[in-house]
């Protein structure tokens, strides 16, 4: 993040030659990563570490997905490199296995749609960010970076915590993404350690607030729940106890990251994870879809009860 530099931009997008390559994108979440020319992305107001939309024309309209610019190159300005993984390209940009080849597309600086209601966002297959904040709260911020149909029900959980606790002490930052027929995750997901506030204008307004606590609701495919983040372990234990009490399925394990039972990529401990950048006491909760669907609000209640007691009121 510290490598990112603010520069004035003079346009919002550029036509690009998308080159598909092997073994060039740095390790990590390469399906969401791209490499671009620094001067060219600066022209659209973006920089290294920030997000862009990459669009590809199709017979039925436009295929698009969000990408993070993880590195830059000094070749022709309009060249953008993506990893040549056929499954990822099919899911993200609708490239069929028989037609995985370089293409001409567009790189757009706009990440979130502006001025849409939640219903309009769903109807338009779009992606928005919502912020509920009184301008001075420093107690708690609850977030769902992957709401809508990206990681279903997580936005409802974050909204419920905000409704249950006093708005004077709780802020909410929630993103919602949709795609008819499925595929919202492939189109709109940006991993939490990559999220740049420079690509999310509403998030940027609260990034330097230094909240006392932050909570992030997430979904994953593992049939369990992981409680992680930088919040003290004794608070994680309280959260686990509260969640176990409301999740009635004994087959769903509720683990904490310090027990080393959570996959490293999902333990929420990274300092650049957005939940930990918002507060030194960041709490990340990863949940399988079954618990989100049938116990999501109960889990949100449990989290609100524990964190609510800790906020300085």
Each language-model region and where it sits:
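Terminal interaction modules at protein C-ends
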Residues: 59-61
């Amino acid at each position: 993040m510290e490598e990112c530099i603010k520069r004035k931009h003079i346009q919002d997008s550029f036509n690009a030659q998308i080159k598909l390559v092997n073994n060039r994108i740095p390790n990590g979440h390469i399906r969401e990563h791209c490499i671009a020319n620094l001067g060219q992305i600066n022209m659209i107001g973006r920089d290294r570490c920030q997000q862009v939309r990459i669009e590809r024309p199709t017979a039925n309209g436009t295929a698009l997905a969000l990408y993070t610019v993880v590195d830059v190159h000094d070749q022709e300005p309009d060249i953008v490199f993506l990893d040549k993984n056929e499954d990822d390209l099919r899911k993200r940009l609708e490239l069929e296995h028989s037609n995985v080849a370089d293409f001409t597309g567009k790189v757009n600086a706009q990440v979130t749609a502006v001025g849409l209601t939640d219903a309009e966002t769903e109807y338009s297959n779009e992606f928005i960010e919502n912020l509920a904040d009184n301008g001075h709260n420093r107690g708690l911020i609850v977030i769902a970076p992957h709401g809508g149909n990206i990681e279903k029900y997580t936005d409802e959980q974050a909204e419920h915590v905000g409704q249950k606790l006093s708005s004077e002490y709780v802020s909410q930052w929630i993103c919602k993404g949709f795609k008819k027929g499925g595929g919202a995750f492939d189109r709109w997901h940006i991993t939490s350690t990559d999220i740049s506030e420079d690509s999310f204008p509403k998030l940027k307004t609260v990034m330097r607030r230094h909240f006392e606590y932050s909570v992030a609701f997430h979904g994953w495919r593992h049939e369990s729940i992981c409680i992680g983040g930088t919040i003290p372990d004794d608070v994680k234990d309280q959260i686990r106890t509260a969640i176990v009490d409301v999740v009635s399925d004994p087959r769903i394990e509720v683990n904490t990251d310090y027990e080393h039972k959570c996959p490293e990529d999902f333990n929420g401990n990274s300092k650049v994870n957005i939940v930990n950048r918002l507060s030194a006491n960041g709490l990340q909760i990863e949940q399988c879809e079954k618990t989100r669907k049938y116990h999501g609000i109960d889990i949100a209640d449990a989290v609100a009860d524990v964190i609510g007691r800790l906020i300085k009121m």
